[in-house]
Amino acid sequence: IGKSFKVTSNSWEGTGDGHALALRAGGKLLGMEFIQFHPTGMVWPPSVKGILVTESVRGDGGVLRNSEGRRFMFDYIPAVFKDKYADTEEEADRWYTDADNNRRPPELLPRDEVARAINAEVKAGRGTPHGGVYLDVSTRLPAEVIRKRLPSMWHQFKELADVDITEQPMEVGPTCHYVMGGVLVDPDTGAAVGVPGLFAAGEVAGGMHGSNRLGGNSLSDLLVFGRRA
């Protein structure tokens, strides 16, 4: 259903047709309010707005900064995560080389927390010229390391935005990414409840991922239930 939103990582065909077909055939939908927004999608130029910027950028040391240059994620650590995420830049940076003895950087909070934080910064007037925030890896790693670890991101920004991420920060913002809700199915077979002969697999099916899908799980969901269907 990503194309229902102004900004999405979904392809052109993500229009919710599968959900509508099942509903019209007598099927049931559940959990359609559970929609996942990936915190880092491209925001410029308009033709590529919403394309994913992989979490590997943050996992390899990239940090989020607002238009004032401030590393703002330290302001958005929920109380429930205080014991697991660093509250200083020094500890957060140490985690990359000593994860056993330091807490994680707040840039690696769950996707929904990071997306809300970015949205809050933009709404507060601390966003980039194109309505996002800065994701910076250029000041964190040598250029040759960036090109080796993040070749697809280097190519993506160079080709689509004329930005060299080894020298410049990226502009990123939340993008509609995945809907956890969908057609109510039998959890063992993928058969749509109430509609004999109808099966749903992948993102069109609901309930497999609760209220917040874990990264990578959608692939196993699609393969397992696609095969069963």
Residues covered by each model-derived region:
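Glycine-rich loop(s) and the adjacent beta-strand/alpha-helix scaffold that form part
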Residues: I1-S47, I51, D83, N217-R228
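Short helix/loop capping segments that flank catalytic or ligand/cofactor-binding pockets
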Residues: S4-F5, F72-D75, K82-K84, E144-V145, ...
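An anion/pyrophosphate-binding glycine-rich loop and adjacent beta-alpha core
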Residues: G27-E159, V163
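Generic beta-strand/beta-sheet core signal
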Residues: M32-I35, S67, F74-D75, D136, ...
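Short, small/polar residue-rich loop motifs at catalytic or cofactor-binding pockets
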Residues: V57-G59, H177-V179, G216
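A glycine-rich dinucleotide-binding beta-alpha-beta segment and adjacent secondary-structure elements
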Residues: K148-A205
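Catalytic phosphate/nucleotide-handling subdomain of diverse soluble enzymes
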Residues: V193-A229
